[in-house]
Amino acid sequence: MQVILLDKIAHLGQVGDQVNVKSGFARNFLIPQGKAVMATKANIEHFEARRAELEATAAANLAAAQARAAEVTALGSVTIASKAGDEGRLFGAITTRDVAEAVTAAGVKIAKSEVRLPNGPIRTLGDHDVRFQLHGEVFATLDVIVVAE
């Protein structure tokens, strides 16, 4: 199925690209979320009329994400207190939700979907580097310090 992308989609294309995707992906994800429209003749003409507006919106979203990334980096580190055993192992784990709440409490609004924990949940005390994906191509890193309660 041919669609026109209205937003930058990772591994698929940029704003305005006409791409061929599976019909289920288009019907169930891209079109309902407003990230694409079917590539009919009328939609192509309508998109070309709105191209500048959509590209300006995409640039504004990128600039906002870069500003948030600078705020996250400026925090330096965030401390999270959790119950732990004698050997430095946590009772439970620090998940993306816990990291997002700690960063939001520190003053920068972060959604849990933006937190990336590549090694899974944090299960030990100490310093851990956590990545945040604030936009398709904007990343920030923050030091999360886990201490015993």
UniProtKB/Swiss-Prot annotation:
GO terms for biological process: translation. SUPFAM superfamilies: L9 N-domain-like, Ribosomal protein L9 C-domain. Keywords: Ribonucleoprotein, Ribosomal protein, RNA-binding, rRNA-binding. This is Large ribosomal subunit protein bL9. NCBIfam families: L9 (TIGR00158). It holds the Pfam family Ribosomal_L9_N. Binds to the 23S rRNA. It comes from Haemophilus influenzae (strain 86-028NP). It comes from the Bacteria. Belongs to the bacterial ribosomal protein bL9 family. InterPro entries: Ribosomal_bL9, Ribosomal_bL9/RNase_H1_N, Ribosomal_bL9_bac/chp, Ribosomal_bL9_C, Ribosomal_bL9_C_sf, Ribosomal_bL9_N, Ribosomal_bL9_N_sf. GO terms for cellular component: ribonucleoprotein complex; ribosome. Disulfide bonds: none annotated. One of its GO terms (molecular function) is rRNA binding.
